[in-house]
Structures are given as C-alpha cells and as structure tokens.
Amino acid sequence: MSHPARFTREKIPLNIDGVQLDVAVIHRSGPKAPILFLHGFGSTKEDYADITLQPPFDGHPFIAYDAPGCGETECSDLSRIDIPLLVKTAQAVLKHFGIDTFHLVGHSMGGLTGLMLAHEEPERVLSFVDIEGNIAPEDCFLSRQIHDHRREDDARFFKDFIERTRLASDPASALYAASLAHKVRTGAVRGIFESMVDLSDNGQLMDKFLALPFPRQYMYGVTNSHLSYLSDIAAQGVHLACIPDCGHFPMYSNPKLMWQHIKALQDRA
C-alpha cells in the first residue's frame, strides 16, 4: 500500500568556507510561519519528522537536516566541524530555501547552534525553543567528557563515550547510545565537543540567551531540574517547560508533551 509523502527528502550541496557539504534535508511547504529544527549531537533530522503527525502544526512549513558530521550529510573535511561552521550551515540552508523569518527549535548541540544563530540575526527569529541547549558551563555533561576522559585516539574516546552513555541512568540513554556509532562520524566528535565546551565556558551564552528579543522557552527533563539557573531565567521572562518521565531526550521519552510545549510557545509569538 502506498502512502502520501509526509515530507520531501533531498540532499543540497553547500560550500561553507571551503568545506564541501551535501546536506541531507527533510522539509515541507505551507502557508504559515516556517520552523527550523536543529538536532543534537548523536541525533538526526528524523527526531522532528513526526511534526507531520501533529495536527496543531498543520500548515507550517518546516526544515530539519543532518548537521555536518551526522546522519546522511556528507562533509569533505570532518576536522573543520565546530559550532561556528554549524551556524553557517544553518544560515546557508535557510538561504537555499528562501526563508526570511522563522520559528527556531534546537536540542542540545542544536540548541547551542540555534542560540548563536539567533544572537547573530535576532530580527529573523520569531521564537526559540531551546531543548537543553548549552547556556552555561554546567551544561557540558556530555561534551566536557572530551577533557574529563581524555584519549589521544579519537576512535577510542568515542567508543568509551558510547559505553558510558549506554550505562548512564538518565532516561533513554541506552536507546540514544545504541545508534551513536551509526549517526556520528568519529572524526567530527572532537571538534564539536571542544567547540561546545569553549563556548559554554567563555562565550557569555547566558547573556546572549537572556538578551534575545522574542519569546524563548527552555525545555528540560525532570531529571535535570537541578540546573542552577532555572529560577533565574524564569524570573527574566524565559518560559520553562519541564518534561516529566524524561532526561535529556524529550523526543524519545515524552514526545507528545514536547510537541505541546513547542506549539504553546510558538502561539505566543
């Protein structure tokens, strides 16, 4: 039995500062405000594909793509991948599709990428849902392992990282770990993690996040309710969305509530 296509899947060639990319994208068109989704480290564009099964989002165009070093996207030089390159990739994807203003959703690495994108071009962003993206040094519980569990061999580091993640107590950690080796190129790990740590420690991310002039939501799993800054950012106008029965991965542990909170913020914009 054939089924109507929920979205279009394609690859688009881009050149970012001399790095050749073939970016794997899923997208659809529509009359309403578009949504740009940025996935986290170890995830892919498919984290957001089920937007097409959520009736409240009917009519909204969306774009989700595999970041360089991840999923089906091809990259000519994995060693060049860092957060600034990921930001430029997002800008190039938006340009390719002719998107001017948009709602922004980013998870983890994608949340940090989204923050830097929004900081550079705040006039283009209608709203920002930051799903446990880095806004403070304490958010580097995954990426800081590049320093805390240092290995000279990147393949050995990544293998050990996967095993630590598989045994972690956070909800959905084992599920996440099971596909890490298939979704991330080993050669991209160090550059991404070191860039995330450097920005979290030295990039004034909290100041950037709080200065954004549009509706913002910080979504987090209940197991991360200990984050020290939550009450402070709420007092400064950030909407908090705590997801029960969930850790770092609401799209795996509680997707229904994740979608509800995303829509609630976008309706405020």
What positions do the PLM features span?
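Conserved acidic catalytic loop of the alpha/beta-hydrolase fold
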Residues: P84-F102
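Conserved alpha/beta-hydrolase catalytic His-Asp/Glu region
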Residues: C140, A155-A211
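Conserved serine/cysteine hydrolase catalytic core
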Residues: R190-C242, M251
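Gly/Ala-rich beta-loop-alpha elbow adjacent to hydrolase catalytic centers
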Residues: G106, G110, G114
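Flexible "cap/lid" loop of the alpha/beta hydrolase fold
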Residues: L115-H119, V125-F157
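Conserved HGGG/HGGXW glycine-rich cap/lid loop of the alpha/beta-hydrolase fold
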Residues: V19-E72
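Catalytic histidine-centered segment of alpha/beta-hydrolase-like enzymes
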Residues: C246-W259
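Short beta-strand immediately N-terminal to the catalytic nucleophile in serine-hydrolase-like folds
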Residues: L104-G106, I131
